[in-house]
Amino acid sequence: MTKKIVLQIAYQGTSYSGWQYQPNALSIQEVLKTILKKIAGFRISVISSGRTDAGVHAQGQIAHFHCPDHPHFTDPRQIQKMLNALLPHDIVIRDAVMTDGDFHSRFSAIAKEYRYTLSLLPKPLPHHRLFCFSPRYKLNIARMQEAAQYLVGTHDFASFANLGREYSSTIRTLYTLDLSEQEHLVTVICRGNGFLYKMVRNIVGALLDIGKGKYPPEHLLDMLATKDRRKGPPSAPPYGLSLHHVCYPPPYQWFCKHEHNNSSEGK
């Protein structure tokens, strides 16, 4: 069976058109494929756990590629070091493992965790400005937290799925939707079994309406019931969003073990 290299990737999405290759645009996927071609001498297809949009970041994107018959592709740690030596400063391979199983970055995933960061300051601090959204109005965090609990569980999230995409189903399960406040930053932690296009940003947009007092917390129940995205608020901007973690079942739990104790980034 062909071996696969599995990568855990962090990136700052500011300068990119998203994960997926697009003509006449710079994508994370294309940068990785270009670097792999430099190492191997031929193009290698890289498959991720999911596509992040333009401007969206990642702390724990997962991607894999089939391991070519090449001397540089025998040791995952060496692959990690070579990639990090050649990648731009805003893309880092956090970890790399080799597997000979049926693992697939997308289809083997059982859960994902996204985090959206809000700044409560009218002007974010310089080192936060590329990674958080400042709504510039006062937010009632307690009301937002109350509203968030209405979305936890299995629901039809059609009202939170952007138009223009075809879905086999808009039913998803949210395991967690919590707000964590620390000093002047609020992090919306959203963990579920899968997400529709712009679903997290649309949820955050709805929570912002609750937080500024436009609607009561129970309004999210009405949104679920309408199943109509056109009646929802605008999406929150992409730059506050990050793909934090992707979960896999045994025996593919390498990065669950490494998430908190991987002190070396291989660069």
From Swiss-Prot:
Active site: D53 (nucleophile)
Top-level taxonomic group: Bacteria
Amino acids binding substrate: Y114
Protein EC: 5.4.99.12
Gene Ontology terms: biological process: tRNA pseudouridine synthesis
Catalysis performed (reactions): uridine(38/39/40) in tRNA = pseudouridine(38/39/40) in tRNA
GO MF annotation, one: RNA binding
Protein's job: Formation of pseudouridine at positions 38, 39 and 40 in the anticodon stem and loop of transfer RNAs.
Family: Belongs to the tRNA pseudouridine synthase TruA family.
Name of the molecule in the record: tRNA pseudouridine synthase A
Originating organism: Chlamydia trachomatis serovar L2 (strain ATCC VR-902B / DSM 19102 / 434/Bu)
Primary gene name: truA
